[in-house]
From Swiss-Prot:
Pfam families: bHLH-MYC_N, bHLH-TF_ACT-like_plant, HLH
Similarity-based family: Belongs to the bHLH protein family.
Organism this protein belongs to: Pisum sativum
Gene (UniProt): BHLH
Protein name: Basic helix-loop-helix protein A
SMART domains membership: HLH
Cellular compartments per GO CC: nucleus
GO molecular function: protein dimerization activity
Cell compartment(s), UniProt: Nucleus
Amino acid sequence: MTAPTPENGCNKLQNMLQAAVQSVQWTYSLFWQICPQQLILVWGDGYYNGAIKTRKTVQPMEVSAEEASLQRSQQLRELYESLSAGETNPPTRRPCASLSPEDLTESEWFYLMCVSFSFPPGVGLPGKAYARRQHVWLTGANEVDSKTFSRAILAKSANIQTVVCIPVLDGVVEIGTTDKIQEDLNFIKHVRSFFIDHHSLPPKPALSEHSTSNPTYSTDHIPAIMYTVADPASTAIPNQDDMDEDEEEDDEDDEVESGSEDETNQGHNQHATSIIEAAEPSELMQIEMPDDIRIGSPNDGSNNLDSDFHLLAVSNQGNPSRQIDSYTTERWGPIEEPLDDSLQIQLSSSVLHHPLEDLTQEDTHYSQTVTTILQNQWIDSPSINYINYSTQSSFTTWTNHHFHPPPPPDPATSQWLVKYILFTVPYLHTKNHDETSPQTRDTAGVNSNDPSARLRGKGTPQDELSANHVLAERRRREKLNERFIILRSLVPFVTKMDKASILGDTIEYLKQLRRKIQDLETRNRQMESEKSGVTVLVGPTEKKKVRIVEGNGTGGGVRAKAVEVVASVQVSIIESDALLEIECLQREGLLLDVMMMLRELRIEVIGVQSSLNNGVFVAELRAKVKENGNGKKVSIVEVKRALNQIIPHNNI
């Protein structure tokens, strides 16, 4: 019986993942399978069932939700492969319906980044579930640290709150959602039922290099990426003593493919191997990041996806037939080879083991994966200049390409500078004199082609005339503004600060001053007439009568004769400011009655000047006009009518 093809295996696995995640309405489902060469859990297949930001399709008709999710899962995988392959291969033209990184939601980014992770048995949620052969349920995945969940930073960004890893016969099924769900054993049984009847134990890899009958991987699901072992000694396996000979022969084959290692790197490898055997493997990729883009802790909520990193150009030495996107659990060692003139980093194919820290390696893996994904996008941008730096030093090797000696001076330039100085310096102190000289103005048009005139900035007579007009107009406006400022300071009653209001208030103030002058002159004449005992008419326009002091013939006293005074009311309202002038016969409590009447009219008095002379009451009131309940203000006619009702109009 023939084994199933890889396409059938992938479709079968994806159908099971699709059925499982859609039955529980979670966000995504993944299958982690054992890599037969490295004996670690790697990404086998997945199905995305979450929110979609931008749909890109070439199909003319609408598709169902299931077909859209299936197509989205395939597009996400194609996007990751195209971006990862762009690290070493030149980018190829992609179809117009292909996704771009800016088309993804945060949950799609989480699904895409999961492809780059790998888990040794006992490490991470999938590794623990596989090693213990029991499920692992994590609630609040976006709130824990990287020790508990190595993808905590991604989960925090995508708001993935619940992650469940369920071991099956030949791998681990991971399913996640953006909702916070508590552990449920019936849920575990339900999801496991989709896989328990379809998978069988994969055949064991042949331990003898002479056997070719056994396949190297399970035929039920084919890994999408071939994985290579950078150093077999770094992988802890139970039958280490039984497979020493096989590993030595495999090492010889690897040396033929990848080339001989440097002696210095071999020494580091031997020392690092003894350290790494006692430590727990981590999840790292083959790109080392500079210190300025390492992510300190997932708890701070930092997200450096949009930062402009300095990218490292990794050159894989060895057989080109090897897959470029292979994964290892090792870190790059120090660079021993010197930098060449073009500052390109030449990395040795050998890698070194280092002791593991608590959080550095998980965060480094996250930063490295983001850089690998986005590197192809940044390379396409013409506005970014890349310089390759060493990860071990902040300095670069000096080369003569960076030093450009200054070019020898051009004799023509020196001559031009000398001429410019000779023509310009003599006219610096005589510039004002030349501009005001009539002779210069007359000859400016004739000598317009003179180079000295051009150097002095001379123009045509029309230009000079226009410039003079502009300067004159500017000075006139400045003087006018200064005078308005002085006028505003002289007028005590200014309603607004614009020029028209200042002029209007000034005119009104002058009228008031004129009336006061007339009143004072009238009083002076009245006082003089009282002294002489002669009746004096004030004037034809005033229509006033004053008290005349007459002496009787017997000299028994002075009798005051009261005459009638015509009442006068003047009201001026400008917006909310009001000025009221009242002149009438004196009455007890008249000023109080006037102020109460103004209060009823929603007029607030802010200043009062009043006087009483020979029974004549004169008052000047300044007030603010307020709006009534209807939003309207009282008019001048209404104020006059109200005041005329309370002031006396004839002699009592």
